[in-house]
């Protein structure tokens, strides 16, 4: 047994001490993070001056070598954050993430670009890039785990992206549409699966607030303002479909549609809004008829009259309105008899 130990030990020592070069080194650098570098490329992209380092990133971008763009641009920003070359490097860093399919991280890097270097970039162009990214997520693109593995859709994150666009540039060209799409994202979330109705209604409420803000902040743009009021109405209308919120929220929906019709009568959505108002008022009239019948059975004629009158006010030409008029004629004599008895 001992005869085998010494040779094996010798072989192990020689193996461990034998000089080897890793064919695929993974390197960590403070501020730059982990990176993979092939044996032939190690250090070739690194420079000692900001301009030279940025030039490496730009040359790599021209060749669509986005891995090198990422490394060179990130090093420029980390090592020389206050240099004149940092803004362009930050933009290239964001573009490298976008080109490599990590849209969420790209959005964040564009956001850093606008916050830290707002005077050194084409503000509108950067925000348009952010809108394209947010639009992809709103369209159903999945957010990725570790920037690599498509995992889940998130309308909440999509809404927050649009809201960040607005927060950073509230008067920019894309801000009104970003505010509207934030509301659209919350509506999509409300239409999805929820553990409770309360959570669903919270999301509709967030959509309402987004559209309300769009109207208040951008009402000088008639197209945006009219659409904001319309979408505010549809959000309230969808919320009202739950019985708990029926009357109060239905009135909010009607008010939003009526505001749109009064302020922007020529909007393409005018006819649809009118039809929605009529439908909701007809449904409210039906509810009033039901309550009126309850009072009528109890021989509470005056109470019944109140609700029949309400049904007529809401939808005079509807089936429910006509029914209310007929019942009012019937109970009128009972009301007179009751009044006569009370007078005696």
State what each model feature region is:
Residues 21-344:
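Acidic, polar-rich low-complexity tracts and alpha-helical solenoid repeat scaffolds
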């Amino acid at each position: 047994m001992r005869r085998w130990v010494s040779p094996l030990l010798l072989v192990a020592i020689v193996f461990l001490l034998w000089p080897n070069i890793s064919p695929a080194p993974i390197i960590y650098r403070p501020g730059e993070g982990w990176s993979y570098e092939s044996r032939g490329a190690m250090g070739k992209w690194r420079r000692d001056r900001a301009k030279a380092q940025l030039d490496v990133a730009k040359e790599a971008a021209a060749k669509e070598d986005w891995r090198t763009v990422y490394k060179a641009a990130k090093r420029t920003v980390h090592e020389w954050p206050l240099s004149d070359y940092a803004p362009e490097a930050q933009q290239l860093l964001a573009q490298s993430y976008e080109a490599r399919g990590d849209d969420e991280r790209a959005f964040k890097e564009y956001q850093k670009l606008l916050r830290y270097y707002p005077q050194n970039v084409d503000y509108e162009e950067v925000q348009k890039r952010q809108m394209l990214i947010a639009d992809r997520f709103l369209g159903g693109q999945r957010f990725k785990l570790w920037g690599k593995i498509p995992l889940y859709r998130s309308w909440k994150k999509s809404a927050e992206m649009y809201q960040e666009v607005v927060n950073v540039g509230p008067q920019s060209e894309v801000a009104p549409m970003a505010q509207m799409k934030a509301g659209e994202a919350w509506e999509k979330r409300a239409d999805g699966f929820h553990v409770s109705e309360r959570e669903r209604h919270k999301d509709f409420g967030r959509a309402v607030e987004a559209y309300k803000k769009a109207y208040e902040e951008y009402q000088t743009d008639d197209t945006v303002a009219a659409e904001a009021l319309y979408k505010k109405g549809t959000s309230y209308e969808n919320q009202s479909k739950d019985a708990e919120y029926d009357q109060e929220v239905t009135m909010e929906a009607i008010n939003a549609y009526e505001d749109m019709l009064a302020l922007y009568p020529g909007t393409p959505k005018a006819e649809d809004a009118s039809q929605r108002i009529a439908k909701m008022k007809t449904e409210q009239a039906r509810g009033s008829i039901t309550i009126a019948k309850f009072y009528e059975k109890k021989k509470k004629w005056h109470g019944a009259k109140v609700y029949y009158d309400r049904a007529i006010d809401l939808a005079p030409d509807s089936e429910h309105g006509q029914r209310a008029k007929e019942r009012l004629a019937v109970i009128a004599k009972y009301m007179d008899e009751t009044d006569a008895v009370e007078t005696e």
